[in-house]
Amino acid sequence: ENKMPGYIGQSGTEDKNAALQSENNIFTCKKNDEFIIDIEDLGTDGEGIGKIQGYTLFVKDALTGDKVRVKIMKAKKKYAYAKLLEIIEPSEWRTEPACPVAKQCGGCQLQHCSYEKQLEWKRKKIQDCLNRIGGFTDIQTEPVIGMDIPYYYRNKAQFPVGYDKDGNIVTGFYAGRTHSIIPFKNCLVQHPCSSAILETVTKYMEENKVSAYNETNHKGIVRHILIRTAQATGEVMVCLIINADKLPYADKL
């Protein structure tokens, strides 16, 4: 057996189930294999990209410059998706997310990356697309112009409504790649008025026993709360997406 560089077995130990090189020297791995890798780049969805002998690993929450321990979750012929287990050496890009639910929530992918590095990553992605896809090798992109305060800037959001395990009405955003709601009303990238609006709507639903929609049995009324703000005028539009012809007790909202 020829064990791969960076391979540390399953559950942290080397064993006979090690990732192998086949006879034609192609790297292979399988679910639950663990590796230590260096993250070299970021993908289009903000996931870290590392390589082992040309084989690509995509690692959520990893950053360029990180040295990490990962576990294979889904292996394909030329690439695999891996789970971040441990940050052995953090990247200079890494910072503490300002949002307390940034890791669970699927709304933001790069809050653990410094804002200056996020802007540099955007510039690099544009440059790569121009060079690799467009063939414009003689064009150089200028630095991305960022915001003075990179929070509370989005003017539109759609918040799903549901129930927690105790039967309480909750709203927030879906966890990544799921329809499980992460209860949170103080999103740092949405307009500050969103928090008060979500609080008002959920209170109205509780007081008037207006149900939230259940995706399993397709019953219930309120599915989403859509909020759009106009930065120039200060106007706010609130729409409730409902599973009914009329919204009960609308006059009390």
Features from the language model and the residues they span:
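Accessory RNA-recognition modules of RNA-modification enzymes
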Residues: 3-12, 16-253
